[in-house]
Curated annotation (Swiss-Prot):
InterPro entries associated with the record: Bi-component_toxin_staph (IPR003963), Leukocidin/Hemolysin_toxin (IPR016183), Leukocidin/porin_MspA_sf (IPR036435)
Originating species: Staphylococcus aureus (strain MRSA252)
Position of the signal peptide: 1-25
Gene label: hlgB
Family: Belongs to the aerolysin family.
Protein name per Swiss-Prot or TrEMBL: Gamma-hemolysin component B
GO molecular function ontology, one term from the record: toxin activity
Quaternary structure annotation from Swiss-Prot or TrEMBL: Toxicity requires sequential binding and synergistic association of a class S and a class F component which form heterooligomeric complexes. HlgB (class F) associates with either hlgA thus forming an AB toxin or with hlgC thus forming a CB toxin. Interacts with host AMFR.
Domain of life: Bacteria
Regions that span the bilayer: none
Keywords: Cytolysis, Hemolysis, Signal, Toxin, Virulence
GO biological process: cytolysis in another organism
Keyword Signal assigned: yes
A GO CC annotation given for this chain: extracellular region
Keyword Plastid attributed: no
Length: 325
């Protein structure tokens, strides 16, 4: 089969877009609010909300930490976004002869957006910068009067004045975390993207790697292999975990609410995976690979109402979106 014909045919096909919005079908649970009085000034209110997309194998676990501080003129909400995003990996057909393909999890996106007026703003977040470490770890600390600190590690930077702390800890082997370009006082987002992938000691390779003869050798097992196309990919267990299995995100955002503003506001939390199409073909002399970015996208959004006065949240809506090239 000719790869160029297949790609042209795929691109020529109109984009498939399916929007599903139905809160009744979403599996959402919200725990009762727990209250912890730190001292005569600070009280903490905590609740956890979960929402799942069984179809996309995406789950959101959101921990809402409300901080009521009498020494500060604003309400503070520390939101931890955790859960699971499946890679969507689709293995090759071992019977494919001279052409074969896989779909793999190339990038994961998480964003938090404040759907309100200027009374609610995003004032801090973690991670704050690009990170290429194997394991990302940050600790957020809140001290009296609204001071927020974010440090590397799981406990660094805290002191005796810390009234509240929260941590994030996730693994991203061969991937890197970047901050979304549209991060501002209303939105914050992160992308965890395949960055430096090794192939049996060769590489590193990325989504855009290219060799003038062999193309992108990201997951190609052998240039001169006599195996069928469907058996000439590197073994699944040799691929990075995030490319073939699941990503377990953990991100933090801090929202500030002006006390003379509206008592309720809305936020939208978005989890998304981008799947690339990776192909190999035999041209009669050697094998060559090609990677096509963002060939399939699966997005799961949940919208919550935030009750700042009673320190509660309510799931308003969920939406599943498919985007196929």
């Amino acid at each position: 089969m000719n790869m160029n014909k297949l790609v042209k045919s795929s691109v020529a096909t109109s984009m498939a877009l399916l929007l599903l919005s139905n809160t009744a079908n979403a599996e959402g649970k919200i725990t009762p609010v727990s209250v912890k009085k730190v001292d005569d000034k600070v009280t903490l209110y905590k609740t956890t909300a979960t929402a799942d997309s069984d179809k996309f194998k995406i789950s959101q676990i959101l921990t809402f930490n409300f901080i009521k501080d009498k020494s500060y003129d604003k309400d503070t909400l520390v939101l931890k976004a955790a859960g699971n995003i499946n890679s969507g990996y689709e293995r090759p057909n071992p019977k494919d002869y001279d052409f074969s393909k896989i779909y793999w999890g190339a990038k994961y996106n998480v964003s938090i957006s404040s759907q309100s007026n200027d009374s609610v703003n995003v004032v801090d977040y973690a991670p704050k910068n690009q990170n290429e470490e194997f394991q990302v770890q940050n600790t957020l600390g809140y001290t009296f009067g609204g001071d927020i600190s974010i440090s590397n590690g799981l406990s660094g930077g805290l002191n005796g004045n810390t009234a509240f702390s929260e941590t994030i800890n996730y693994k991203q082997e061969s991937y890197r975390t970047t901050l979304s370009r549209n991060t501002n006082y209303k939105n914050v987002g992160w992308g965890v993207e395949a960055h430096k992938i090794m192939n049996n000691g060769w590489g590193p390779y990325g989504r855009d790697s290219f060799h003038p003869t062999y193309g992108n050798e990201l997951f190609l097992a052998g240039r001169q292999s006599s195996a069928y196309a469907g058996q000439n990919f590197i073994a699944q267990h040799q691929m990075p975990l995030l490319s073939r299995s699941n990503f377990n995100p953990e991100f933090l955002s801090v929202l500030s609410h002006r006390q003379d503003g509206a008592k309720k506001s809305k936020i939208t939390v978005t989890y998304q995976r981008e799947m690339d199409l990776y192909q190999i073909r035999w041209n009669g002399f050697y094998w060559a690979g090609a990677n096509y970015k963002n060939f399939k996208t699966r997005t799961f959004k949940s919208t919550y109402e935030i009750d700042w006065e009673n320190h509660k949240v309510k799931l308003l809506d969920t939406k599943e979106t498919e985007n196929n090239k």
